[in-house]
């Protein structure tokens, strides 16, 4: 069993379909990383299946949660407006993200 998961990946920033404004932006974690995280966090889960993580995107770092996406079977990471503004990114951009499960 895994004891720790840190993953670095590139992904496209996208807007959640349920909210047409640009306030809900996400990146999708790769399938293999999502499987590793699911294995590491097996058992009782927090609300909505959330998993606490530490994130680095560009020069920005923060603690947040990732959430399982029933459509893809992967976890998704919300990227708040202050981070997008600080990094000069918007929906459609490809970003490099480092995620560490806490």
Regions found by a protein language model. Name each.
Residues 2-73, 91-93, 98:
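Long, compositionally biased stretches
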Residues 29, 78-79:
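A conserved hydrophobic position in a structured secondary element of the catalytic/binding core
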Residues 39-41, 80-85:
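Short alpha-helix capping/helix-loop boundary micro-motifs
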Residues 83, 100-102:
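Short, charged beta-turn/beta-strand-edge "cap" motif at the junction between a beta-strand
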Residues 87-89:
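Short, solvent-exposed hinge/capping segments at secondary-structure junctions
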